[in-house]
Structure formats: C-alpha cells, structure tokens
C-alpha cells in the first residue's frame, strides 16, 4: 500500500510541476504573466536584445559570505517617520540621487559600497565635502579580501577595505572625474540608444593602478578617503530604518529572480521565475505605497532600468533576503576637519 501511495505522490508532484507555467526570462510572455497577477509591482522591458549571460553577470554578490561585526541596537527609542527619502533629507548631497552603471562586470558589491560611502561622507560633513568614491579603485585593488573582482565579491570586504586601506575618488566611465574614474563602458539595454549593445559575459577586472589619471591632483596616496569603522546592521526593519535615518544610505544585498529583471514600477515582490544570482544595491529610504511598505533602493544598471534606475521592494518581511545582508560604516572625520 505504501508503495502505491508513493507512486501516486510522485505522479501528483509531476502533474503539479507541469501545471506551473514557464516563461522565458526577459520575454514578453513573462511581462504579461507578471502584470496579469496584479500584484504591487508592474513589469516591463528593461533589457532589449540582451544576452541572459550578460544579465547573470550583473548579479555579482556572494550571499552568505563573511560578515562584518554587527553594531549594537539603538533604534528602540527612536521615533521614525512612515516615509523617509535621503534625497530630500540631504538635498545638497548630489551623490544620493546618482545612478551609476557597472557595465559588463559583476561589480555590484563594489558599487553598492562606494555609492553609500560617497553619500555618508557628504552626510557626515554636512554637505561640506561631496566626492564620488571610486568603484574602479575598490574593484581592482581589493583583491581576494573582497572576492573575485568582476566575477563577484563580498560587501563586508568592501567596507573593511575602506577602513583599512582607503579609497580614492573616481566618477563614471569616461567622466575624467576624480583620481580613478570607472573604465568599464556602459552598454545599451534598449534598442535605440547611444551605447554599444550588451552582449556576452565580458567584463575583465581592471588592473589595480595606484596612480591617478594624468593631470589629476592630489596624488593617489593623498586622495584616499577612509572609514573609521564598518559594521553589519541587525536584521531588523526598525534597526535598518534607524541606521539610514541617522547616518545615510546603506548597502544591501538580496536574491535576484527573473521577474526582478522586468521591474518597472510599484513595489517589487517576487512572483515568478528562477533565481539569477546575488545582487548588491544601495538602500536610501523607505515608505508606503497603497498600503504596502517598501524600501527605496538604487540599482547600478543605468537609468534605463526600473524607475530611472531606482526601485521599491517589499519591506519588513526580509523579502528575497533584503534585510539579511545590510552593511554600513562611518567616515574618519579628522581627514575632513579643515573643510567642515
């Protein structure tokens, strides 16, 4: 009898598996399926004529890796607003509103870090110091402490490197801003754009250079920015909110599924598709949309993606692990005393 039940269970599982519809990633069928579910988010096309190998390459964060020391709780007695947007709280800090482009490289772990570090330097100096911290410097020089460069890395290692070795300035690709601007070119997700197409895996990790680009002053060593401490934030909705409210944006990481690639608006919740990989982003606020609490975050897939590069994701339920991998830190303030 038990053998018969086992056969029936297997047949039932097989039938259920066959009944779950499969939609190719990046397809119109997947977009239509997500939108028909009428959830809190809306889907659309962010990647046109783009290889899935390129998209998988973008998700370059190793989840569950080395953890930064966790800071103590301090949110219990804080009165936090229902909505908070660091772009509005610190309007004189331009990096908070910036969307970067990691190009064909799994460097999201580095981008999430340098973006939040740039923001925090401005926040902690009361907007007296505004700098784009170099993703190139972190990506190319951190080495195995951070992971494998364009083949993936650890957010905790990125923040530790900032405190121990420091990071120079550096803007977007071909910007010639700062000591070491990003050297991996952006690519075009859309059909009719000015960038080259996004194809293949590509994305060789740039060579570490401890020299600024010609004509830039001060020197590489003199241009370094340091953190005094880096830490993990407890896996608590209120603790993460308090951290952002007090110190500015943080770096977070989560599991990307195929439906996230199609995000266009609303509050993202995973409803369809398989895992693509781990991805790091910058969380810069929170809010409530039509009764659904969300985190406000910045991606590094250029302004074509999502809401001009930004997105909202379900808050308070550790959705896709978004609240489990929060890392942050505080700048070493004495290096800025002459300017604040």
Swiss-Prot record:
InterPro entries: Papain-like_cys_pep_sf (IPR038765), Pept_asp_AS (IPR025661), Pept_cys_AS (IPR000169), Pept_his_AS (IPR025660), Peptidase_C1A (IPR013128), Peptidase_C1A_C (IPR000668), Propeptide_C1A (IPR012599). It holds the Pfam family Propeptide_C1. Belongs to the peptidase C1 family. Residues 1-17 form the signal peptide. Its main location: other. GO terms for molecular function: cysteine-type endopeptidase activity. One of its GO terms (cellular component) is extracellular space. It is found in: Lysosome. Disulfide bonds join 93-122, 105-150, 141-208, 142-146, 179-212, 187-198. It catalyses: Hydrolysis of proteins with broad specificity for peptide bonds. Preferentially cleaves -Arg-Arg-|-Xaa bonds in small molecule substrates (thus differing from cathepsin L). In addition to being an endopeptidase, shows peptidyl-dipeptidase activity, liberating C-terminal dipeptides. Its EC number is 3.4.22.1. The active site is at 108, 279, 299. One of its GO terms (biological process) is proteolysis involved in protein catabolic process. Residues 18-79 form a propeptide. Keywords: Disulfide bond, Glycoprotein, Hydrolase, Lysosome, Protease, Signal, Thiol protease, Zymogen. Thiol protease which is believed to participate in intracellular degradation and turnover of proteins. Has also been implicated in tumor invasion and metastasis. SUPFAM superfamilies: Cysteine proteinases (SSF54001). It is an enzyme of class 3 (hydrolase). This is Cathepsin B. Dimer of a heavy chain and a light chain cross-linked by a disulfide bond. Glycans are attached at residues 38, 192.
